[in-house]
């Protein structure tokens, strides 16, 4: 276990990689194979986004921890090191135009999955919606804005 990973467990958070695995598995359960594939594309895109942009959504201290973790294992640092509380701050940017998937149906799935992900995180108390209200509201607003853009 790396130094940074040890810090995560001290913070008592479930790593983003486990959060996303559980959420996307639950979301795909019983769905049509085409929908499961679409959800897989959204998950892969979210993981790519977190690798590319995740640092810009966290504090300087957390960014320094991510840089340290990448010295040990370059790929997947955000998912290994951080928890749901940091993920919720990254989600609004994932719904911004540069990060929306090009395929119409994939894009709608991306918007819907992220909107439901925030609710899922709050309902399972992985994110305190009162403490992180701003990030939760920003994600919901970003989802609504992206949904309007996608359907008009």
Residue spans of the language-model regions?
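N-terminal DNA-binding module of tyrosine recombinases/phage integrases
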Residues: 10-20
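Intrinsically disordered, low-complexity, repeat-rich regions
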Residues: 18-29, 41
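Charge-rich alpha-helical segments
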Residues: 21, 38, 131-134
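Generic secondary-structure transition motif, activating predominantly at the C-termini of alpha-helices
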Residues: 24-28, 54, 95, 99, ...
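Non-catalytic DNA-binding core/recognition domains of DNA-processing enzymes
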Residues: 32-123
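Short, charged hinge/linker segments at domain and secondary-structure junctions
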Residues: 57-68, 123-152
């Amino acid at each position: 276990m790396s130094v940074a990973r040890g810090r995560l467990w001290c913070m008592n958070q479930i790593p983003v990689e486990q959060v996303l695995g559980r959420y996307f598995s639950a979301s795909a359960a019983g769905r049509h194979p085409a929908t499961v594939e679409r959800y897989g594309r959204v998950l892969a895109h979210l993981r790519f986004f977190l690798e590319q942009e995740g640092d810009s959504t966290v504090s300087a201290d957390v960014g320094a921890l991510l840089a340290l973790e990448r010295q040990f294992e370059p790929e997947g640092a955000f998912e290994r090191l951080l928890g749901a509380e940091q993920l919720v701050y990254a989600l609004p940017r994932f719904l911004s135009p540069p990060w929306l998937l090009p395929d119409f149906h994939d894009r709608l799935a991306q918007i819907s999955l992220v909107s439901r992900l925030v609710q899922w995180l709050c309902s399972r108390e992985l994110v305190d919606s009162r403490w992180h209200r701003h990030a939760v509201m920003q994600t919901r607003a970003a989802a609504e804005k992206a949904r309007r853009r996608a359907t008009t």
